[in-house]
Every structure is written in structure tokens, then in C-alpha cells.
Amino acid sequence: MTWTTPAYTELRLGFEITMYIANR
């Protein structure tokens, strides 16, 4: 990944939160 935009950070953060909830 050569593009680091706020949208990408937000997407990655939301994905990690989703995985965290799914693994509970």
C-alpha cells in the first residue's frame, strides 16, 4: 500500500473493531 489516507485508516480501524466484536 502506497496510499495512506484518513479514509484508509478509518476503514482499517473499523475492520479491526468488527473482527474484535466477531471474535468475542
From Swiss-Prot:
GO aspect biological process, one term: pyrroloquinoline quinone biosynthetic process
S-S bridge residues: none
Pfam families the UniProt entry points to: PqqA
Crosslink feature (Pyrroloquinoline quinone (Glu-Tyr)) location: 16-20
Stored InterPro entries: PQQ_synth_PqqA (IPR011725)
Presence of the UniProt keyword Protein biosynthesis in the record: no
Keywords: PQQ biosynthesis
Signal peptide bounds: none
Known pathway: Cofactor biosynthesis; pyrroloquinoline quinone biosynthesis
Family to which this protein belongs: Belongs to the PqqA family.
HAMAP family: PQQ_syn_PqqA (MF_00656)
Record function comment: Required for coenzyme pyrroloquinoline quinone (PQQ) biosynthesis. PQQ is probably formed by cross-linking a specific glutamate to a specific tyrosine residue and excising these residues from the peptide.
UniProt name for this protein: Coenzyme PQQ synthesis protein A
This protein's encoding gene: pqqA
